[in-house]
C-alpha cells in the first residue's frame, strides 16, 4: 500500500499543529487558517518562559489546546481525559498548569494537600459561558416539572459548575456516560460543553434521550466548511499548509512523548 503523505485537519489551529508535531514528515493541511481557539490564543510561549523564571525547577504542564510554541516550552502535555493522572505522577510537590484556569482549579481541588498548582489566567470562551447559578436555575426549573436532571460537564468549566454536576469528564467520557445513562433509562440530561458533543451522542445512541439545550457553539470549530476541505485538498494555499520550525517540533514533541509515557 502507498504511504499516506498528506493529512487534512478539519479543526482548530492548535490541533493541526499537534498533528504536524506527531507526523513531521507529512504535509498537514488546515483548511481554515483563521479557525483558532480562544483558550490556545490566551497564552504565548513568552508567558510560559516568564512563569518558569518566576518558579525555577517547577515542572510545567500544558493542556493540549496550546500552540506548538507553547508546547515547546513545557515539560508535559495533557488532555482532558488524562490530566489528573499525569499531574499526580509528576515529581515534586508543585507544578505549573497552563493555560486553562478552570481546569487548573479543578486540579487544585483534586491535588489539595499533595501538590501546589500554579495557574495561568486563560479560559475557553465556550465553557466560560456556563456558571453555577445558571446550572442551579436549570436544575430547579426541571425539578419543579418533575424532571430529575442529570448534569454532565467538561472540566474546562468553572468550579461552581463542576460542583453542581453529577459527572465531570472529557468530551469522549461525557459522550460515553450519556449513552450509558440512556441505556439504563435515565433519559433527562444536560451536557455542559460544546454543542458538537451533544450531536455525537444523538447520532450514536438508539435509546430514548432527552438532551436539554444548554450547549454553546464554538465559532472556531464550526468555521470549516466542506468547500474549504475540497479546496485545500485540490490546491492548498501557503497559509493552509501547517509549517512549524524544526527546532519547535523537536522541543514540542518532548512534551507529547512525556504525556504518552506518563499516561501508560
PLM features: residue spans?
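Single conserved hydrophobic/aromatic residue that forms the stacking wall/gate
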Residues: 1-8, 12
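Short active-site oxyanion
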Residues: 6, 56-59, 92-95, 147-150, ...
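General beta-strand structural signal in soluble alpha/beta enzymes
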Residues: 9, 29-32, 60-64, 69-72, ...
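Active-site beta->alpha loop and helix N-cap motifs at the rims of alpha/beta catalytic domains
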Residues: 16-54, 58-78
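Long, charge-dense
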Residues: 29-55, 119-128, 213-226, 232
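Active-site glycine-rich loop that binds ribose-phosphate moieties when present
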Residues: 41-50, 69-90, 97-103, 119, ...
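Redox- and metal-dependent alpha/beta enzyme cores, enriched for Fe-S-associated oxidoreductases
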Residues: 105-167, 171-182, 189, 197-211, ...
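C-terminal functional extensions of proteins
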Residues: 155, 173, 193-205, 209-264
Amino acid at each position: 500500500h502507498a504511504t499516506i503523505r498528506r493529512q487534512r485537519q478539519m479543526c482548530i489551529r492548535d490541533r493541526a499543529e499537534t498533528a504536524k508535531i506527531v507526523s513531521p514528515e507529512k504535509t498537514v493541511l488546515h483548511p481554515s487558517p483563521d479557525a483558532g481557539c480562544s483558550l490556545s490564543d490566551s497564552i504565548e510561549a513568552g508567558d510560559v518562559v516568564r512563569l518558569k523564571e518566576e518558579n525555577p525547577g517547577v515542572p510545567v504542564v500544558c493542556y493540549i489546546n496550546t500552540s506548538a510554541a507553547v508546547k515547546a516550552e513545557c515539560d508535559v502535555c495533557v488532555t482532558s481525559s488524562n490530566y489528573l493522572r499525569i499531574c499526580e505522577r509528576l515529581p515534586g510537590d508543585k507544578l505549573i498548569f497552563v493555560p486553562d484556569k478552570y481546569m487548573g482549579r479543578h486540579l487544585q481541588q483534586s491535588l489539595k494537600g499533595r501538590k501546589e498548582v500554579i495557574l495561568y489566567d486563560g479560559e475557553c470562551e465556550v465553557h466560560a459561558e456556563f456558571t453555577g447559578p445558571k446550572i442551579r436555575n436549570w436544575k430547579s426549573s426541571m425539578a419543579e416539572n418533575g424532571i430529575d436532571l442529570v448534569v454532565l460537564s467538561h472540566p474546562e468549566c468553572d468550579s461552581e459548575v463542576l460542583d453542581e454536576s453529577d459527572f465531570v469528564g472529557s468530551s469522549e467520557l461525557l459522550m460515553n456516560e450519556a449513552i450509558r445513562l440512556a441505556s439504563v433509562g435515565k433519559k433527562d440530561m444536560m451536557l455542559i460543553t460544546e454543542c458538537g458533543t451533544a450531536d455525537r451522542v444523538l447520532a450514536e445512541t438508539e435509546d430514548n434521550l432527552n438532551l436539554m439545550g444548554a450547549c454553546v457553539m464554538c465559532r472556531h470549530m464550526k468555521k470549516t466548511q466542506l468547500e474549504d476541505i475540497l479546496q485545500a485538498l485540490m490546491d492548498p494555499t501557503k497559509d493552509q499548509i501547517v509549517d512549524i520550525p524544526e527546532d519547535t517540533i523537536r522541543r514540542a514533541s518532548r512534551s507529547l512523548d512525556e504525556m504518552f509515557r506518563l499516561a501508560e
